[in-house]
Amino acid sequence: MEQFVLELAAPPAPTFASFVIGGNGPMLQALRHLADGELPHRAAYLWGGAGVGRTHLLHAAVAAAATAQRTACYIDAPVLESSTQLGADLIALDNAERLSAAGEQAIFEWFNRPGQRADSMLVAADRSPASLAARDDVRSRLASGIVFEVLPLSDDEKFAAMQAYASARSLPPLNEIFRYLLVHAGRDMGTLMALIEMLDRYTLSQKRPPTLPLVRQLLQQLRIANPLHGTDPV
């Protein structure tokens, strides 16, 4: 069990294909075009609460841009200090609500670079551009492209997504286990899908059917491995 817990710490790289869409179809289509360099807007801004997949989408955009032969980089806003860090074809800037004054200036300079530019920026934050505690001229520039709220999945949508994911892995019906996971294992889809994959691999290796006691054991091991996360396994 411990080995599988360690493996969960390195989940597969996020992609657009692995993002559970829910009500976010138009947003996902726009992000695909942004990553390919085909969006008429230079910038896109995503905002939403914890666990909706903002960071997943930024990493997925970086991967898609690389596939399209574009340079791309992911930057966590607190480490942004200069516009010289913003030299890739696609910049994926996370946690914009945590921009420093130097980071705000870097964003301002990026938007005001002269000439026609083919580079683009994807920004994510936990609040809308208007709600950022940033300079007015920075907020207005971040909102100048397309802005999407990343809509959370309903529990029914999460349940259906888990069923589809399990079915694709030829797992038996696990409705009781899925309901348990929704209550006890955090509500972001990355965590839930990783737990299902982990459960599948473990039961195959042990030649045991997936059961609630096994799931409880798995979650307990995760809490031991990640004590700072409290009831959230990852």
Identify the function of each model-found stretch:
Residues 6-28:
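Dynamic helix-loop-helix/coil hinge segments at AAA+ ATPase domain boundaries and subdomain interfaces
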Residues 145-157:
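Conserved AAA+ ATPase "SRH/arginine-finger" region at the nucleotide-binding site
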Residues 185-199:
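The conserved phosphate-sensing helix
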Residues 83-125:
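Conserved nucleotide-sensing/catalytic segment adjacent to the nucleotide-binding pocket
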Residues 172-184:
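Short conserved motifs of the RecA-like P-loop NTPase core
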Residues 203-221:
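Conserved C-terminal helix/linker of AAA+ ATPases
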Residues 129-143:
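Short regulatory helix/loop adjacent to the ATP-binding pocket of P-loop NTPases
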Residues 39-57:
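Walker A/P-loop nucleotide-binding motif
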